[in-house]
Amino acid sequence: MRTVLKARCLLICFGLFVTQPSTSQERDYLVGINPELSYKMLEPNQNVRKVSVLMDERHANNLAARKLMIGTSLIVLADYQKSNTNSKFAYLMRHPTSANQIGTEASEAVIHSFQFSLYGAINSWIATFAEVLYNPEQSFGAGTITSIDRNQLQLYRGFVLLGNLDKFPLYGAIGKMDAPFGLMNSVNPFTNSTMWHAFSGLGYGAQLNFKKYNIHATAMAIQGGAQFRALSTVVGDSTNVPSKLNNFTADLNYTIPFTTSFEFKIGASYLAGSVYNQAFPVKHFNPGVINNPAYTYYAQALVLKKLLIIAAFAKTVKEWPGTYNPSPPLNIYPASKVSSFVAGAKYTFNPESKIAYTVSAEFSNYIAGPDGSPWERQNQYILGFCGLINNSSKFFIEVFGTQGYVPLNFISGSNPNDPFPEGTTHSSNAAASLGVVLGAQVVF
């Protein structure tokens, strides 16, 4: 018994020793939480350019030097969906496969995702950010949402940020980060736009930014091969081995502050290697056979800091080879370029209140085939309402509808009986679904 008591006392003393700084120098290095900043870094769809978000927060003195910040985000939700076609649910906030959604009705009450982040700055020029993600609903692992392969942790983002906008208009980052391509943000409280699913890239690389005179120019050198999302170039003799830094994207946008209550942003981007470069049959992360660039242009307006309006269009430069199925009867449809469009608006009634209420509406689409083809298009409509609590956590409800069912894997069919019969595809331009999702994101 005495041995147990001694051990407990030693543990308590050790805990007090490691948690209490012994010198004034050690007191300068603090560990803490900043829910408002953590929300901006961990929310999944309002502003996905996290390198720029962190730099802007540093510029606004919201992240002091020599402080390590811990952040967490938990998104839980319940939803119900109904489809007019058996086992074809096109809502993309979970992978649309029959492994997880069967029949013509689906419902769930689940954890959508959990994030844990560490970020901080060692001085006025150097900062770092790392985010660990658990997301069985949207994992690329095989099986159902309870399978081991879909219940894994991953370092979703991680980068070192170099720069000080107070002293110099250039800053950069190296690591795993979102590609600065287009407007991948959404006005929805939870759901990402179809534009995001189609063109929002995530990969290893090095980024350089210029920000001054209301101009923001960004260039990113991206590791080649098939990256984590929406980025792919041919490496060597048609492999996807990421052994060369041979992909890049560039973005330029300009913000026009007409008055203190109205600003307008316009921008355009170019991507050297989009993911739409594979031959038939298409499968995630397979090697490409060409480099297929993409371009985008976008705009957004902010009125009275209450009304936000966005619009964007993106398209590949070349046809996607894999959208041509050589087997009849589907061989009547030629290979097609890929494009996406998004338009939306949201209005916040009381942005300065402890609970800010927002209503939103958004349309986005994905065009991957010629008129009449089963993989022609997938449309998404969202109506949303949310309450943002202390600028750090929110509850939300969305009503959504989809038209078309166009998964990327085997979008135009497969080799005979691998897994589909010859001349068939699981894509459908007639499939449609309706649903409602309610949930909460709690951030510390």
Label each region the model flagged.
Residues 110-113, 153-157, 201-205, 245-249, ...:
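Transmembrane beta-barrel architecture of outer-membrane proteins
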Residues 61-84, 103-227, 249, 253-260, ...:
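Outer membrane beta-barrel
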